[in-house]
């Protein structure tokens, strides 16, 4: 019974995440989807409820034959030694011209808005945002980024309307 209740709450939260409001948030002009695939370390985020207390968070993408994006989101809960949590949503690229707008599906039929709003030319850093500006993920190909880069991304997020007081740096163990 507890599982059904938790699943229902999670599905409701995801369905609410699918709703968008607020002024448009612009995406990058174009994403080379093959280059975007692979592992991304979550450097900081305005977390969803499942990500609170995440350590060593990594989002991995793989382009499936059907054009969807197989996603694995994993992290340690509560500490570096905490239990490893793994989620496997599927991404649906909804803007085929830019590849910068996706619907991320944790449970059918709900898809959460997923917009690539920042991407460095070398594909080493990215920011995923939402029109509601309720969640955001700063990600990189490495577990840490230079402080100047992080500050530049924070300036960008403030410019596009995010409340930086909600942002949480994700502890990452350097390998």
Predicted regions, residues:
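Positively charged n-region of N-terminal signal peptides that target proteins for export
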Residues: 1-5
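A beta-rich soluble binding module of mature secreted/lumenal proteins
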Residues: 19-175
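Bacterial N-terminal signal peptides
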Residues: 7-15
């Amino acid at each position: 019974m507890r599982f059904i209740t938790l699943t229902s709450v999670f599905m409701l939260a995801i369905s609410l995440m699918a709703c968008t409001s607020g002024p448009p948030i612009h995406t990058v002009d174009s994403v080379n989807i093959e280059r975007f695939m692979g592992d991304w370390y979550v450097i900081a985020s305005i977390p969803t409820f499942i990500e609170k207390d995440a350590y060593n968070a990594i989002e991995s993408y793989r382009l499936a034959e059907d054009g969807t994006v197989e996603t694995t989101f994993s992290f340690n809960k509560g500490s570096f030694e905490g239990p490893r949590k793994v989620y496997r949503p599927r991404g649906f690229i909804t803007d085929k011209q830019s590849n910068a707008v996706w619907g991320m599906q944790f449970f059918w039929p709900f898809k959460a808005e997923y917009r690539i709003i920042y991407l460095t030319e070398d594909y080493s850093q990215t920011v995923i945002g939402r029109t509601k500006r309720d969640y955001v993920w700063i990600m990189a190909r490495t577990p840490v980024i230079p402080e100047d880069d992080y500050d530049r991304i924070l300036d960008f997020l403030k410019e596009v309307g995010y409340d930086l007081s909600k942002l949480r740096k994700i502890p990452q163990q350097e390998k």
